[in-house]
């Protein structure tokens, strides 16, 4: 059964990335019931229809940071009204360590001790920890196409997203 190319692998908690077939570098990213586009800018042959891979990585860091801060502030009962995180990615060369610069905006009547503590908590976000310590990556070739890739993910939806400038 595993050798049949039409048998589909269960996705489980995986993130699945498949070509949209609407653009040379446009990908459909699926994760836990959601789908969005990833792409490269037009300047390198993409359609510019979604974040590039480093934009996704920076977005993961920013989202995790904001969520971690929000959850901590709520648990403490602190008056955090809004959190916003800006992340920039820099790499001087292929051999150099990458640098992610985070700017965190905290809105609300927080005192200085609360603001300081929330900045410390930002360092504890799980994505921050993963990036900070590095990761091992295991890659394998599979003869089985994952289920969501075969479902055809609605090329009309992808065209609608493109036409809408999304």
Briefly describe each language-model feature range.
Residues 1-59, 70-166:
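Extended beta-strand/beta-hairpin segments
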Residues 64-65:
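Alpha-helical metal-binding/catalytic segments enriched in His/Glu/Asp
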